Every structure is written in structure tokens, then in C-alpha cells.
Amino acid sequence: MYYYELYMPVLLCSLNPDDGVLKLNEVNKKTRSLYWQLNFEWMKMFDLSAGVIPKLFETAKRSSGKVLEIGAYEFIKNGLLKKNVYKDCDKTIGIVNMKVESTNYVSSLKSKPVLSKTRSVALNRILDESDRQKCEVLVLPELSVPFQWIELLATQSQRKKMAIVSGLEYVVNQADEALNIVATFLPIQWAKYKTDCIPVLRLKNHYAPGEKQMIIDNALKCPKSLSHTDSCYDLFHWRNSYFSVYNCFELASIEDRALMKGKVDFLITTEFNRDVLYYSDIVGSLVRDLHCFVIQCNTSQFGDSRIMQPTESILKNMVRVKGGKSEAVLTEIIEISSLRKQQRESVKKYANPKPQKKAKEVEKTIKFKDTPPGFNEYDIMTRENGYDLIDPAD
């Protein structure tokens, strides 16, 4: 039985907790235990070596303040756990240019999600196209996929060996709370011919004022767990890369944006956002402040979906798109290895400044801008070596 097949029933039970406080970050912990009992517990009777299996799905073991590090590790042979099976850290990123219809997520608020064949065909067309373009990470906008199709995304992620990040339409629990959830699906290979997928769902930390009003107007409530002190973000360590996902209005928090400084190679933001100019200013600053690639995916009618890199302004937008009646997948390769190299050289240059070469020679060798003040060299080396960024003792 696949891990993601067990995840869904555990998730549904967790949406209606007895104490009224949602703890989505504990869903993987419960699923791991159940997965182990059903698939590998019997091996103990035959003294078979399977002690490493539980570690494979130990996805929520390190936390520091508001950051939860999630390591989707893989192992290939001889029962050995491998953190760096994939030596190439560069990634092919795909952003989906699609229109998110307000009628769809409003229907979900009324517990009447639109699960039509037309929507299903369109989503599968997007997934097939991203596979043809050999995407390694596919990003969809906020509120773009019905909550009921989580298992479909997990299945496609596992089969196509492609990470998927998507905002899910609202799901209403028994407490009449409207949950805005962003989902991340991480495919893994834990044996030569055995693959699986680890879904990670996170509740939106900061609902936008207009979003709160819409929920109240539909006679619903925002989750009790929403508060600035309780906010938590995932730091994913997957296939020799580090990234995090922010859900639209979360980017408006300066403190929350700063949590990932030096800790990510790229940052993903899913959006359903009308205020394009404001968010354009935010991500334009973010790409330089965090010195990482930024993948922004908004609904097509508002646009400004793009892939950015920390270079001079004229080159920073690698992909940028708005509009269109039909869905489209736009891909670009982000050179994480080159970025890390530049970060390391930039930090050393700050520490030990030396006379520069001629300007023309410098321009040939430098692609990215220098790192901002206070950029941690230890974090750079940790990412290059594939270690955990957050110490368990923190």
C-alpha cells in the first residue's frame, strides 16, 4: 500500500480535532506509523533487515521557532539511507498559467465543490504537458484544485516523479471553519523499482482581510489556530535542493519572509491576488533579500506569474506571463549550483576583500548579484553538502 493512500483518511480525521485546534503537521507522523505497521511490521517475524524503512518517512523531525524542516530522504540499495542520491541540484521548474474561477472556490465554501469532467480533463492535460516538458517541480495557483483531488495529485506526482505544489480550494470542517490549504507533493524512490509520494499539507497562516470577510459573509469562520505567534512554515529538503512555500498574503509579513534567509535555494509562492503591483514590489525585493530563485504563480486573469533570479533587474525575470484563455505550462531551468557557488564567493569576498580584476573580466564570471549583509556562510555550505539545516537541539 502506498504512503499517500494512507495519508488521505488520516488527514480527513485530522480536519475535525477533538480540541478544535488543527495540527496538520502531525498528519505525516500518524501516517508513518500506520504505513510501517501495515507494510513492514511483519518482517520482524522473519528477522529481515527493515530498520531503515521508518526513517524514510521521518518527515517532520526538526523544528526551530516557526520553521519546520521536512526531509524527504530516499535510499536505493542495501537498505542504506541516502540523502544525496540526486547529485544534480539544478531543477526544471514549471508554472501553470490558468484561470482560477471564483465560482469554483465559492462553491467549495458552500460544501458543493465543482468536480466536473471538464475540470478533471483540464487538470490532467496540465499534468501530462508538464511531464512532456520534463518538469521536476510544478507550481499551480492558490485555490486552483479541489480538495477532493488530493489523491489524484499524489498519484500523478508518484508516477511522473514530479513534485507538485498547489493551493487547494476551501474545505469546511465540522466546526464551520473554512480551511485554505497549500499542498506539496514530494515523489521519492525508496528501492530500485519502488516509488511513492509524501504529501505535506499546511494551513494558510495569514488570511487576507478580504478573504476573511468573504468567509464571514458565507456564515463560516476562520480557523482558531490562526495567529501571528502560531504561524509555521515548511522548509523542504528534497533531491539535493532546499525550498519553502508561501501562500499569497503570507508574503505581506516582513518577519515571516525573513525566516528563510540563507536557508532556501528557491521559494515558491502560490497566489490568487488582485494587487499585482504590491506583490510585484514584494517579490522584486524578496529575490535579492533572500538571494534565491523565486517562483510566483498567480491566476491568469491577474497575471504576473513568473520565475525570478537574483541578478540585475533587466535579467531577473526568467519567465513572466499573464492572460490567455487556455491553460499553459511554462518551464525554465534554475541553476542552483551556480547560485550556491556565487553565494560562497560573495560571502568570502565580504570577509576578505581583495583588489578586483578588470571590469570586463569580472562581468564574464559573475552572473548573480552579491549576497545581502548578514548572509550565513554556514547555511551555504550546509546546503551544498546536503545536510539538515535545522539542528534538533535548536
Describe the residue ranges of each PLM region.
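CN hydrolase (nitrilase-like) catalytic-core segments centered on the catalytic cysteine
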Residues: 1, 148-166, 251-357, 386
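A short C-terminal boundary segment appended to hydrolase-like catalytic domains
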Residues: 337-394
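Active-site catalytic loop in hydrolytic enzyme cores
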Residues: 58-86, 176-262, 282
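Cys-nucleophile CN-hydrolase/nitrilase-fold catalytic domain and related Cys-dependent amidase chemistry
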Residues: 115-202, 273-275, 284, 288
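N-terminal active-site segment of His-dependent metallophosphoesterases
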Residues: 77-134
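Structural motif
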Residues: 136-137, 163, 241-243, 266
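Extended repeat-based interaction scaffolds and adjacent low-complexity, acidic/S/T/P-biased segments
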Residues: 1-83, 91, 329
